[in-house]
A protein has these predicted regions:
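Positively charged, low-complexity terminal tracts
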Residues: 1-98
């Protein structure tokens, strides 16, 4: 199981870069330096919704309020699949340990 890191340009009116780290424990860490945002959220609290400029990544339960980040459809698709791969790796590891 590996930590995966990726950088996405947010598709907002004020573009910024979101540095995302997918932890093998099922957590997504997000840092947007331009907005002074940094948070960690469980994969179970991450949603993808169609937005006006692509897809919206919704991270629930972040300091009591959801955080929404606009991604291109391609970037959202890639992130979704990276999260699914991490989930599968974690499930395989847990089964092997049982």
């Amino acid at each position: 199981m590996l930590i995966r890191r990726c950088i996405y340009t947010l598709a907002d009116t004020h573009p910024a870069q979101a540095h995302m780290t997918l932890h093998p424990t099922g957590e997504l860490e997000v840092e947007v330096a331009e907005r002074q945002q940094h948070f960690i959220v469980d994969f179970d609290h991450v949603l993808f919704r169609r937005g006006e400029q692509g897809m919206v990544l919704i991270c629930e339960d972040v300091a009591g309020a959801p955080v929404c980040l606009s991604l291109s459809a391609y970037d959202a698709f890639e992130l979704y699949h990276l999260m699914e791969d991490s989930r599968e790796e974690l499930e395989e590891l847990m089964c092997d340990l049982a």
